[in-house]
Amino acid sequence: MKVLFLIQGFSVAASRYRVLQYIPYLKSNGVDATVSLYPRTLKENIRFFSDLPKYDIVFLQRKRFNQPRLGLLRKRARRIIYDFDDAVMYRNSKSKDPISQSRRRRFAQMIQISDFVIAGNEFLKNEVLTFHPNVEVIPTSIDQNRYSLKDYNIKKKRVTIGWIGDHGSIHYLEKMRPIFERIGERYRYSELKIVCDIFFDCEKINVVKKLWKSEEEVADLQSFDIGVMPLVDDPWSWGKCGLKIIQYQGVGVPVICTPAGINRDLVEDGINGFWAMGSEEWEEKLSILIKDPTLREKMGMEGRRRVLEGYTVQACAPRLFSVLNKK
């Protein structure tokens, strides 16, 4: 079976976690896998479309083709699988109105020319079912061998509140700046660690600014004592697949999150982390975990157990292989 995987970039999170980490497993099971970036130039497009018949499957990760390339794609490709892990049919949380007819139209067109669709969560699956019956949920996952448990025996002088992500989502964290200021004032030994490519400052809490690097990602996560994932409860957020939480839990870090979308499934309030809505709840839950290292470890271990149940490459790779073999 020859499969062409189209991705947005080799360092893009969705490409790494929904395609690239599965390639070794697929190849070891007889899949002739080729990974390529989406064509951009005229020359790249000509080569891409001329080569399509060579492959049994073209696997598109997230990005949608527009007309007239969409029609040409359907004509040239033997079989199309579309994978996505964001609410691409809505505007993002920065917009006042999430509804976009043009986005929804492009999404529908992409779904309708596909033979099979892989959605990152149940909300996205239900969006697909409006246009196509052949859809399956495969969650975003991590490699349990790479994401090893943090060492809780290491004694630290500071309690680190951590967040990892990219510049497109840091605005959720930045809105919490007043909360972090008050936490820093109450707990002088607390700090905020941001692993990203852009940062912001706070006056009353020390901010550790760490540029994201793939080879240091797990170590950075293990340095967190509390992982946070604030969101806005809107359609864009409902489409998120909880990678931050899965990463935190994968190394045994307790989580505080906004109970929106998949966050409610990943975090059992009071078991492997806490839900928090307004400023008072965020301060309350942060305070509880800052003051109680035993609870942090207990919740962290529960979180890792949750991830190992179904959010690992080891659990999801066979499911992806099964989809590729569907006729």
Q: Which residue stretches match the model-derived regions?
A:
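Membrane-proximal helix-turn-helix segments that form the acceptor-binding/catalytic region
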Residues: 46-54, 68, 72-76, 88, ...
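Carbohydrate-associated surface elements
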Residues: 123, 141
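Conserved catalytic-core segment of nucleotide-activated headgroup transferases in glycan assembly
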Residues: 10-25, 143-147, 154-223
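A short, well-ordered alpha-helix in the C-terminal region of glycosyltransferases
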Residues: 288, 295-310, 316-319
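Active-site proximal beta-strand in glycosyltransferases
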Residues: 58, 74-91
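Conserved acidic donor-binding segment of nucleotide-sugar-dependent glycosyltransferases
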Residues: 269-280, 288-294
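Nucleotide-sugar-dependent
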Residues: 171, 215-220, 227-250, 256-265
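N-terminal pre-catalytic "stem/leader" segment of glycosyltransferase-like enzymes
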Residues: 1-57
